[in-house]
């Protein structure tokens, strides 16, 4: 990975103190999206890293995972599968509940979106506690998909998500890390 590109990416991410609650330093990836150079650098790095992995599907988690997963799928020439909150997907779904850094939620995946022939990469904007991706991986594996890789733009290592996901036999790629919550 190009250190100059990684620096551009990290510098483009704004930190918002006390959002969504006091004591949290929110890492705002939307500021990266507003910066064409940073967004392109992000996508270029992900494409270069994953172009020869043989994935058949990219799964993105609601909602900011879509912003990186869908363009990556397009560039890799594979399908994109959204994982959504309850009631947002129109076909038959399976669901998985999970804990996140600010509470509890549920994710859903179409039952016909992944099968035993799929080799899947999971993409999200941020790795914090790992709960969202753990639930996403469980959904994919329930449908028979193989998932061994997850990619993130941002990681907050102090929250332990990387360790949690590595215990699920996932190989992680993170473009930049920030201290704290």
Swiss-Prot record:
Pathway: Purine metabolism; AMP biosynthesis via salvage pathway; AMP from adenine: step 1/1. Its EC number is 2.4.2.7. PROSITE patterns: PUR_PYR_PR_TRANSFER (PS00103). NCBIfam families: apt, PRK02304.1-1, PRK02304.1-2, PRK02304.1-3, PRK02304.1-5. It catalyses: AMP + diphosphate = 5-phospho-alpha-D-ribose 1-diphosphate + adenine. This is Adenine phosphoribosyltransferase. Homodimer. InterPro entries: Ade_phspho_trans, PRibTrfase_dom, PRTase-like, UPRTase/APRTase. It is found in: Cytoplasm.
């Amino acid at each position: 990975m190009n250190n100059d590109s990684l620096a551009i990416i990290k510098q483009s991410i704004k930190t918002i103190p006390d959002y969504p609650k006091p004591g949290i330093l929110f890492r705002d990836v939307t500021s990266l999206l507003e910066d064409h150079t940073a967004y392109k650098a992000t996508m270029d790095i992900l494409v270069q890293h994953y172009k020869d992995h043989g994935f058949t599907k990219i799964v993105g988690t609601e909602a900011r995972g879509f912003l990186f997963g869908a363009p990556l799928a397009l560039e890799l020439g594979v399908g994109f599968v959204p994982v959504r909150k309850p009631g947002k997907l129109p076909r038959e779904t399976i669901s998985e509940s999970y804990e996140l850094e600010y509470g509890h939620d549920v994710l859903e995946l179409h039952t016909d979106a992944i099968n035993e022939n799929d080799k899947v990469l999971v993409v999200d904007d941020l790795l914090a506690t790992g709960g969202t991706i753990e639930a996403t991986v469980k959904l994919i594996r329930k449908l028979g998909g193989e998932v061994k890789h997850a990619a993130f733009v941002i990681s907050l290592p102090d929250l332990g998500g990387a360790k949690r996901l590595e215990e699920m036999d996932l190989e992680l790629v993170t473009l930049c890390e920030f201290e704290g919550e």
